[in-house]
């Protein structure tokens, strides 16, 4: 589904050169303060955002930390995706997922895939560790400030990231939210 209704011209005047070396993707839903969670749970579940996440990542490779995996229903890997879980626990195993124990091991595993097909899906530590290796960020911004204990790096404060597409305003009950596509631009 193409949630982005307005692209490039509005945001960049068409003159931003986007980096295209290692195009790993990152995807997250954030509130006004770039918060992503509390007590290892999402802040809110918005069906349209979940649908966008599902459609964007199905058939792709998703990279996550152990806590993110354990926050899924029954702690099970996501269906119809290659799940890669990064944990420092050497004994950790999970059915239907690839478990790696270091960034080096993760990078060796990722060499098997087209980086266009790799989506970093959380949580906070994984986002922080892998943001610099991503060139595209799909961010759902919820116009509300939640009580939270986990955050995504604020891309609006990072000059190397620019919004290249956005959606019209979306609503879910009394919540307003938008889909934004950020891309890392060349210096």
What are these regions (language model features)?
Residues 7-23:
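Short, Lys/Arg-enriched N-terminal segments with co-localized hydrophobic residues
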Residues 22-187:
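Enzymes that bind and transform nitrogen-containing heteroaromatic metabolites
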Residues 1-4:
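Short, small-residue-biased leader/transition segments that mark boundaries at the very start
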